[in-house]
Curated annotation (Swiss-Prot):
Residues 244-264 are annotated as: Linker. Binds 1 Mg(2+) ion per subunit. Homotrimer. Acetyl-CoA binds at A377, N383, Y384, S402, A420, R437. Residues 265-461 are annotated as: N-acetyltransferase. Keywords: Acyltransferase, Cell shape, Cell wall biogenesis/degradation, Cytoplasm, Magnesium, Metal-binding, Multifunctional enzyme, Nucleotidyltransferase, Peptidoglycan synthesis, Repeat, Transferase. Its EC number is 2.7.7.23, 2.3.1.157. Catalyzes the last two sequential reactions in the de novo biosynthetic pathway for UDP-N-acetylglucosamine (UDP-GlcNAc). The C-terminal domain catalyzes the transfer of acetyl group from acetyl coenzyme A to glucosamine-1-phosphate (GlcN-1-P) to produce N-acetylglucosamine-1-phosphate (GlcNAc-1-P), which is converted into UDP-GlcNAc by the transfer of uridine 5-monophosphate (from uridine 5-triphosphate), a reaction catalyzed by the N-terminal domain. One of its GO terms (molecular function) is UDP-N-acetylglucosamine diphosphorylase activity. The gene is glmU. Pathway: Nucleotide-sugar biosynthesis; UDP-N-acetyl-alpha-D-glucosamine biosynthesis; N-acetyl-alpha-D-glucosamine 1-phosphate from alpha-D-glucosamine 6-phosphate (route II): step 2/2; Nucleotide-sugar biosynthesis; UDP-N-acetyl-alpha-D-glucosamine biosynthesis; UDP-N-acetyl-alpha-D-glucosamine from N-acetyl-alpha-D-glucosamine 1-phosphate: step 1/1; Bacterial outer membrane biogenesis; LPS lipid A biosynthesis. Its cofactor is Mg(2+). This is Bifunctional protein GlmU.
């Protein structure tokens, strides 16, 4: 008989059985060596707690988040869900007990904010196990377990005849028990009434003087209740307690995001070199070359191409547009259909119209550039006067020559031409030509005589 409930298709929960998720998020994470609460550290551009909140919200009727004192940032992220404060950090059972008044009358699952990658499917399977779906009867207690590649010092789940008999910590395990590959992930689910009673009975007579949630497993077994393990992949149940583990979790999230992008019809030429944010949208037929970074808030429309070594955040790339290589799109930028943003071009809060091109070595900030306009190499918008930002508006079908400096606020009308090397400080009318540079003067023989004088000076020391 299998000792665990296998990873299977998700089961629907009975409509009459309410379920509450209690998320423990009070830990500061001393091993992270950070002033930031552990659950606020980002994975793929968003706080790790956000993943758990979003998945739990799709499964549970109610979510309660347990935070520590002074963790207003975490409480704000948890909104609109209920938040309770664990004034003294006295262990996981003590933390869960702070939410006991909000357990309700159905099932309660205790999740961990620093274990953010558990999927909604696994949460549903745990609740289904507790409710008895797929079994002859429900479990008095269901717990999540995994088979990590390196079991290391994880607590081992000891089973007999398909039921959990006990959790044994690595330090207390015999050689036979240490050989067990099924490990405890700490996530538990039980009926609200049972959970309240068990939490109230947990004692702190241990070396750390803390109240451990895992003790309720032994209580359930002692009462003769069925305790079952629901197995999930290690990547879902990994905890994050250090910067190294944060990096491992980031790699896991990136694998998920890349797989989703590929399944959605985007091409990633070298997926392992592309880094996505949790909210990155890549429409079908998007092509992403190697070594591209997507920050939060990026949408790339169908058929666009993002070339190598480009960095995008907070922007929209239109259908068929071409970005890079070595381009940077900053927040507030919107690149129109079939527009080009070339190598070493930076856009910030700039709209580039359909078919417009900025192919080389430009900075375009706080600007609106009309359709089919060409921006020459080296053009910049001078948008900042040291205190305020100012806008540059360039119409449709314009030609801005190379090395032009556009001093905002300034407007260039449709069809206008700006000569190369110009400094533009005044508005340019439609179809006009603007020339803002000093007239060239040639002095015959002056170059040779000047160089000769300089060489003599160098020889004289």
């Amino acid at each position: 008989m299998n000792a665990t409930v296998p990873s299977a298709a998700p089961a629907d929960l009975p409509a009459h059985r309410p379920a509450t998720a209690v998320i423990l998020a009070a830990g500061m994470g001393t091993r992270m060596k950070s002033d930031r609460p552990k659950v606020m550290h980002p994975l793929a551009g968003q706080p790790m707690l956000r993943y758990l909140l979003d998945n739990a919200a799709s499964v549970f009727d109610r979510i309660v988040v347990v935070v520590g004192p002074g963790m207003e940032q975490v409480a704000a992220l948890a909104a609109p869900h209920a938040v309770v404060v664990q004034q003294d950090r006295l262990g996981t059972a003590h933390a869960a007990a702070q939410a006991a008044d909000l357990f309700g009358t159905g099932d309660v699952a205790v999740l961990y904010g620093d274990n953010p990658l558990i999927t909604a499917d696994s949460m549903r399977r745990m609740l289904a196990c507790r409710a008895g779906e797929g079994n002859s009867e429900g479990a008095g207690l269901a717990l999540m377990a995994m088979r990590p590649r390196d079991p290391g010092r994880y607590g081992r789940v000891v089973t007999q005849d398909g039921l959990v008999r006990r959790i044994v910590e690595w330090a207390d395990a015999s050689d036979e028990e240490r050989a067990i590959t099924l490990c405890n992930a700490g996530v538990l689910c039980a009926g609200a009434e049972d959970f309240r009673r068990w939490l109230g009975a947990v004692r702190n007579d241990n070396a750390q003087g803390e109240y451990y949630l895992g003790d309720v497993v032994a209580m359930a077994v002692a009462e003769g209740r069925q305790v079952r393990a629901v197995e999930a992949p290690e990547d879902e149940l990994r905890g994050i307690n250090s910067r190294a583990e944060l990096a491992e979790a980031e790699a896991c999230v990136q694998r998920r995001l890349r797989a989703a992008a590929l399944d959605g019809g985007a091409t990633l030429v070298a997926p392992e070199t592309v880094f996505l944010a949790a909210d990155t949208v890549l429409e079908p037929d998007v092509l992403v070359q190697p070594h591209v970074v997507f920050g939060p808030g990026v949408t790339v429309r169908r058929g666009a191409e993002i070339r190598a070594f480009s960095h995008l955040e907070g922007c929209v790339v239109g259908p068929g547009a071409l970005i890079g290589p070595y381009a940077r799109l900053r927040p507030g930028s919107d690149v129109g259909a079939a527009a080009h943003v070339g190598n070493f071009v930076e856009l910030k809060a700039t709209t580039l119209g359909a078919g417009a091109k900025a192919n080389h070595l430009s900075y375009l900030g706080d600007a609106t550039i009309g359709p089919a306009t060409n921006i020459g190499a080296g053009t910049i918008t001078c948008n900042y006067d040291g205190v305020f930002k100012h806008r540059t508006d360039i119409g449709a079908g314009c030609f801005v020559g190379s090395n032009a400096i556009l001093v905002a606020p300034v407007s260039i009308g449709d069809g206008a031409l700006v000569a190369a090397g110009s400094v533009i400080t005044q508005d340019v009318l439609p179809d006009a030509m603007a020339l803002g540079r000093a007239r060239q003067t040639n002095k015959d023989g002056r170059g040779a005589s000047l160089q000769a004088a300089l060489r003599r000076k160098k020889e004289q020391g």
